[in-house]
Regions:
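PEST-like low-complexity, intrinsically disordered acidic/proline/serine-rich tracts
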Residues: 2-319
Length: 319
């Protein structure tokens, strides 16, 4: 209790990365793309992206730090808390940009008292609790407003959505389909058209997702009603009503525009984040864990990538 953590880094090696193009969109020219499909429905096929701060916090908020703290040199005083070592190391990258919010009505999320306490605790510990950091599938609606593009491929009876983060995907069934045998991260989506609005009921969640990085969450009882309404050929109004009687006192709604990516070479680039989270998830099972030991108030961390003696590939690579 009351330790001020310093991290002693012994050495580090940074490896090279490789990204692969998954899909390429048609030309960004609006004139070359029909506004409607052959069956007369709005044409949502293409690459889209939300441009807002909902990924960090659905509610209105000022810009702030990563707000993960630990006791300082005066552990009995809350005002003397200091940034936790992992957040401090990230600098401004751990900050949260300000936002006017996307929650409709009074802007409040109607938590039950015990759920509100859990949300607060989540927010204070997002650096090791947020499912995004573990590269878990982001779930719906979070996948819709992460700061990465996603692709819609539309047909008469199915709508496919592919997301950049974690190679997530889902199918919106416009035809009759049986429910899934198990609950999942991305849920089960069944859609219908009401005029030009696509309405999607999403159920069968496993309750392991968050709604944003601020710690807003839901349970496996979550039910969503999404509405996709065209504003222009290149913008969609996205609304989702969120209902979860185990967490919230009433249904509530968020809304935002989604924008079509118009670059001629717009495409999804693979983001295989699981390989970036392996140490975070499984580092404790290393034969020699990176968190080596405590020396008083100093945590000794070794992030050296050990090379076995006589490794021929490494010797060849270093030539």
């Amino acid at each position: 209790m009351g330790k001020t953590i310093a991290i002693a880094v012994l050495s580090a090696v940074v490896g090279a990365g490789l990204t692969l193009a998954l899909t390429r969109s048609p030309s960004g020219s609006t004139s070359s793309r029909p506004a409607r499909t052959a069956d007369g429905k709005p044409n949502f096929s293409g690459i889209w992206q939300a441009i807002n701060e909902a990924h960090w916090d659905l509610q209105a908020h000022e810009a702030r730090s990563g707000i993960v703290t630990q006791p300082g040199v005066y552990p009995s005083y809350e005002f003397a808390r200091v940034p936790a070592a992992p957040v401090l190391a990230l600098g401004a990258a751990a900050g949260v940009p300000g936002s006017i919010g996307v929650v409709e009505g009074d802007g409040q999320i109607p938590y039950k008292p015990e759920a509100a306490a859990m949300k607060k605790e989540n927010g204070e510990h997002w650096i090791d609790r947020d499912p995004e950091l573990k590269c878990y599938l982001p779930g719906i609606p979070r996948a819709m407003y992460m700061p990465y593009p996603f692709q819609i491929v539309q047909s008469a009876n199915k709508i496919q959505m592919a997301y950049t983060f974690a190679n997530a995907a889902r199918t919106i069934h416009l035809d009759k389909v049986e429910g899934p045998p198990d609950d999942t991260y991305m849920g089960h989506s069944v859609g219908r058209w009401e005029g030009d609005t696509l309405i999607v009921d999403v159920t069968s969640f496993n309750g392991k997702n968050w709604l944003d990085r601020a710690g807003n969450f839901h349970s496996a009882a979550l039910k969503l009603v999404e509405r996709y309404t065209p504003i222009t050929p290149d913008a969609i109004r996205y609304e989702v009503t969120i209902e979860d009687p185990e967490v919230f006192t009433r249904p509530w709604t968020i809304s935002m525009p989604l924008y079509r990516r118009l670059e001629p070479n717009a495409q999804l680039i693979e983001y295989p984040c699981i390989e970036f989270a392996e140490e975070f998830l499984y580092g404790h099972v290393r034969k020699q864990p990176l968190v080596r030991r405590w020396e008083g108030e100093t945590m000794i961390v070794d992030i050296t990538r050990k090379v076995p003696p006589g490794d021929k590939f490494y010797d060849w690579y270093r030539r």
